[in-house]
Every structure is written in structure tokens, then in C-alpha cells.
Amino acid sequence: MLPPWTLGLLLLATVRGKEVCYGQLGCFSDEKPWAGTLQRPVKLLPWSPEDIDTRFLLYTNENPNNFQLITGTEPDTIEASNFQLDRKTRFIIHGFLDKAEDSWPSDMCKKMFEVEKVNCICVDWRHGSRAMYTQAVQNIRVVGAETAFLIQALSTQLGYSLEDVHVIGHSLGAHTAAEAGRRLGGRVGRITGLDPAGPCFQDEPEEVRLDPSDAVFVDVIHTDSSPIVPSLGFGMSQKVGHLDFFPNGGKEMPGCKKNVLSTITDIDGIWEGIGGFVSCNHLRSFEYYSSSVLNPDGFLGYPCASYDEFQESKCFPCPAEGCPKMGHYADQFKGKTSAVEQTFFLNTGESGNFTSWRYKISVTLSGKEKVNGYIRIALYGSNENSKQYEIFKGSLKPDASHTCAIDVDFNVGKIQKVKFLWNKRGINLSEPKLGASQITVQSGEDGTEYNFCSSDTVEENVLQSLYPC
């Protein structure tokens, strides 16, 4: 079925195929699957390299604040730079209407420098990205070709290993990374897709979009996977990697308001008064990745068939082989390339560093009478103490047990005690006492269980402390 958003564009489609050639980058056609399809009815050719004006900005631990311009067509620029052959190289490619200089890609490089020695190359193709979306979709073919040309130059001119190359791309940048990887025969070590763009790519042939064959290892973070119509989702719901992560279900991110108008965030001063907008959900993917560099343990992805099953704790705790870390350290997962389209879910925090640690709480009640109300617990750990989390609301019956999963924004450490609180709902003329006889806390990461006991009962809104049994 023809996507509704393409109906108007279909009227502009042309029939006759055309081709344009750009020297060492090769030739580019407007034939299928690149154009003239249901998703891509408008037949367009990519702009020239001169018009796109792609720049490769090299940052290293030696020059974290000031980039060095390098290019594959002039190997001397690489040899004269701080590029180090004994380090990994991470390319970061921005998406539609965005830029790399003085923006999130260069900030991400700086975070990497805190944990590793690395060549960090930001790919700035702002001129090609600030076009009509359908034109920008075609322009990434040239940017991908230029990126592949530079990587090939590193290999042939300097003997650099393709397996040490990691290409990170956001939105259209994810498919740009795919084009580079495809041109290099899928031999680059890793590609990370940060909410790969959906329009013009969802369900399209592998040749035009990101897929697992584009690199030795492909990991993907989906944060805005609702349909473009009517939800204005800019990402893909399609699984396109070896590991596909769907934080918070992959559609609505905590801290991003659901009202369409209020979820719109402008880029670069609304592109100097002219350009378009991207959604908060779409941006979250690179924010999560960036945070994961310094907070590797706060983004564990749980293998699960669906987000609903994950929320119901049907995929808890992590299996014996462990859970992969979404983001920078996903490549540490032993089973990363054992299959394609491996699916993982997790919840994140609303703001700050977005980290989250998942626990399953089981509470057994004690007392003498049934009360209608709710119960809350707080964790007290060797690192920090958590806020109170609601575990259950409804009929509170003595000897009844209630189980709930919670997501804590930080690592509390070894849990030393828990505190229980209850409150009644509605009118109750008596002054009942209720307590928790046992609370079990299970860690999602390794399945460790902590058991706490008490024989006390307390009045409403009075904290009860439970210690190890």
C-alpha cells in the first residue's frame, strides 16, 4: 500500500532514468531501488561532492577541542594529522538538518576521550542535509561514498585495519554509514545506527538502507519508531542489525512530552530561520549512546519478544550468558553476531544521564485486617538510597504477596535494607496496622536475590525498616 505521506510526491515522479558520475566516487542512478519506488516516487539524483561539501573533522586525545581537516583524496592531510594507527577509529555522522561541528558529534568525541585513546572523525555534511528531505535521502549516497573512500585510503595508504573502524550514524547518518559499509564489502568492524531514519527506508531493499551485512557487527537503537503518519515518528520500527535495542519500547521516550507540538525541538536556531524540526524522541538515541560511554552498566538490554512481556517481567533477570549493554559497549556482548535481529528492551531515566537499573520486588504482607490502599518500598544500598516506588495498590490482605519490577535511575550498590510504607484509600474509621513480613529484591543484571524480614506492623504513613533475614 502506498504510504500516505508520499501521495503528493508521486505526482512529481519522472519516468526516464538518469545517471550522474562523480570521478573516483563512481556513478549514481535514479533507477530502482534508489528512486521510482512506492517509498521513493520522486526521481532525484544526489548533489555533487562540491555542493554537499562533506568535511571530515578529526579529533583525537591530543586535539580534543580543535579539529584537523583530513580527506581521502589528499593522504598527506592524514599523515600530517594526529591520526594514530594503533587506535580505533570512530566516525560519527549526523542526520537531516544537522551538523557535526560544535554539536553533539564533537561532544560525543570528548566523552570517548575520557575512557579511551581513539581517532574520532566527525562527518559534517550540513550543506547536503539542509535540503528537502527527499533530496537529502539521495545526498547520503555521495556522503557514504566519500566516507568509504576515506576509510579505503586509510587501509591502502597507511595499512589501517578495517576491523578497527566503527561508524556511528544518527537518522539519515545511519544509512550513510550503511552505504559506506556496503561499498567496503561489509568489512568494517562495526556500524551503530542511532534511530535510523524511517521515511524512504522502512521495508526498502537492503541495498538502500542499513542492514546486518554492512559491517562485521551492526547494533541499532530505536527511539522514535512510531509511524510517520499520524504519529510523526521519524525512525524505523524494522529490525536492521545484529542487536536491535528498543529502549522504553522504542516509541515514546521518558521526558519527551506526548503532545506533538511540544515534542518538537528546533535544530541550530531553526536552521537560521529556515529549516525544519526533529522530535525529542528521535534525538534521544544519540543522547543515550553518548551517556553510555561514561555509564556502561546503566543501559542493560533484556532479550524479549515484546515490550509488553518485558514490562510484565517475563524476561527477567538476564539469562546466563548475560545482557548486552546498549550503546558504546554493545560490542562486548559475546553473542553479538550469533544471529541477526536479536531484540532487546530496557527502560531509561527521564533526564540526566538516562541510566536505569532494574529490580523485581516481591512483598509479603502481615497484619490482622484487610485494608484498601497502596504500598511503597525504598532501597537502601551501599552506594545510594532510592526514592519510594509504588509496588501495589488495591486490597491489602494479610499474607498476600505482590510483585512488581522497578527501574532505579542509579546503581544503589549492595542492598543493605529496605523500607516499607503503606497508605489507605478511602474512609476507614479503624486505625489498622499493616506490615511487610518479607521483601525479596532481585537484581536484573545477575539475578542476585536479597531477602529482608520483619515481624513488625506499622500504622499508615509510618516507615517500617526490614533487614536481612
Swiss-Prot record:
Leader sequence segment: 1-17
Active-site annotation: S171, D195, H282
Keyword check for Secreted: yes
One GO term of the biological process aspect: fatty acid biosynthetic process
InterPro entries attached to this UniProt entry: AB_hydrolase_fold (IPR029058), Lipase (IPR013818), Lipase_LIPH (IPR016272), Lipase_N (IPR033906), Lipase_panc (IPR002331), PLAT/LH2_dom (IPR001024), PLAT/LH2_dom_sf (IPR036392), TAG_lipase (IPR000734)
Region (Required for galactolipase activity): 93-105, 257-279
Keywords: Calcium, Cell projection, Cytoplasmic vesicle, Disulfide bond, Glycoprotein, Hydrolase, Lipid degradation, Lipid metabolism, Membrane, Metal-binding, Secreted, Signal
EC top class, as a word: hydrolase
Major site of localization recorded for this protein: secreted
Membrane topology summary: Peripheral membrane protein
Ranges for domain PLAT: 357-469
SMART domains tied to this protein: LH2
EC number: 3.1.1.26, 3.1.1.3
Carbohydrate-modified residues: N353, N428
Summary of the function given for this chain in its UniProt record: Lipase that primarily hydrolyzes triglycerides and galactosylglycerides. In neonates, may play a major role in pancreatic digestion of dietary fats such as milk fat globules enriched in long-chain triglycerides. Hydrolyzes short-, medium- and long-chain fatty acyls in triglycerides without apparent positional specificity. Can completely deacylate triacylglycerols. When the liver matures and bile salt synthesis increases, likely functions mainly as a galactolipase and monoacylglycerol lipase.
Protein family: Belongs to the AB hydrolase superfamily. Lipase family.
Cross-referenced PANTHER family: LIPASE, PANCREATIC LIPASE-RELATED PROTEIN 2
Protein's name according to its UniProt entry: Pancreatic lipase-related protein 2
Source organism: Homo sapiens (Human)
